[in-house]
Amino acid sequence: MRRNKGKDEQEQHVNDTLIASGFQKVASRPVLTLNKAPGPGTFCRESLLGERKADFILGLWDGRVAAIECKVSNSSTNSVKRLNNDAAVKAEVWFRDFGTRQIVPVALLSGVYKIHNLESAQNRGLAIVWAHDLNELVQWIRQTKT
C-alpha cells in the first residue's frame, strides 16, 4: 500500500506540473498508432500505448511522443523490479512498436536505486528524471519546441 500511495502522489505531482507548464490534459484512450497519441502540448493519464500501458503519454512540440512511467522504490532490491523489469522492458516494447525516432520513454523516479540498474535502464533507451526536480522534465519538454 505504501508504494501505491507514493506512486499516486508522484503521478498527481506530474499531472499538476504539466498543467502548470502549459500542457492541456486530454482524455485517456488506447494509442495503438501514433496518430492516436495526444498532439503537441497535450497529455493523457494512464493509457495503453502499443502493447503496454504508460502512466502518462505526452505530445512533444517536435512531433514525438513521450511515454512517462512513474516509479517509486523503497529499497535498492526493489529497484530492479520497478526500473529494469518494468519500465525498461516497456521502453523496449515501445521502441519495437513505434520506432526509436518517434517515442521517448521516460522513467520518473523517487526513492532508492542502484547505480548499475540506472545505467542498465539508460543503456536500454530509457531517459531518467528524478521526481524531486520536475523542473528538469519541464525544461526538457520546452527544448522540444526548437
Features from the language model and the residues they span:
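Interdomain/boundary linker segments immediately adjacent to catalytic/signaling cores
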Residues: 1-22
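Conserved catalytic cores of phosphodiester-cleaving nucleases, focusing on short active-site segments
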Residues: 56-58, 62-74, 87
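Short, charged/polar micro-motifs that form catalytic or ligand-binding hotspots
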Residues: 1-8, 77, 107-111
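Surface-exposed cleft-lining segments at the edges of enzyme active sites
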Residues: 1-3, 39-45, 74-78
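Active-site metal-binding core of divalent-cation-utilizing nuclease and nuclease-like domains
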Residues: 27-62
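A short, acidic, amphipathic alpha-helical segment used as a generic capping/interface helix at domain edges
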Residues: 83-97
